[in-house]
Amino acid sequence: MENNDELMPREKLLAFGAKALSDYELLAIFLRTGIKDCPVMSLSKNVLTHFGSLHALLSADKKAFCSVKGLGITQFIQLQAITEMTKRYLKQEMLSTPIINDLETVKLFLLTELQHEEREVFMVLFLDNQHRLIKKERLFLGTINVSAVYPREIIKEALYCNAAALILAHNHPSGITEPSYSDQLITKKIQDAAELMEIRVLDHLIVGKSDCYSFAENCLL
């Protein structure tokens, strides 16, 4: 039974692609084997039930991760390595492709960067005149409101790296991506300051636990 349970997700992936698999099936492939009296598929479901979600599992620190029966330091190290490789892959994709042509890659990148943060983080992507990434910068931490975000600091950094365009981003630790009035006001202030220097604000993305809200897609820019 163990072998059948282990092979089923792999066969499904080969036949239909990784997107066809559930969270626990993907985790089962990662875990590879179960433990005594607990086949890998059951172990995978137990692990996800314990953490509550794939997001919580990936966010767990070493102590919390290794405290779960069937998980250990080896799996923790492997999962951290996979997560970091994903971040680097997405960054390299953004460096080689005009960002404006691939908003989904930007969203995935920002999710890997910000979805696990317990505090609000305001990040800016600085782009060249072909909308390729020059650099990313975390500029403000804590409660993100009009008094905590300084447009002049953003414009100063943009001029320093000769950026022609910006993508703004910040996370909502609550997971709710709907923009507040304060979010809209901050965006307008930055946009006005950028226009004075002939720098475009292409989008402002609010990052939740599993998705992003785009100001541009919702006609708020």
Swiss-Prot record:
The keyword Hydrolase applies. Transmembrane segments: none annotated. GO terms for molecular function: metal ion binding; metallopeptidase activity. Zn(2+) binds at residues 170, 172, 183. A motif (JAMM motif) lies at residues 170-183. Residues 98-221 form the MPN domain. PROSITE patterns: MPN, UPF0758. Pfam families: RadC, UPF0758_N. One of its GO terms (biological process) is proteolysis. Keywords: Hydrolase, Metal-binding, Metalloprotease, Protease, Zinc. Belongs to the UPF0758 family. This is UPF0758 protein NTHI1125.
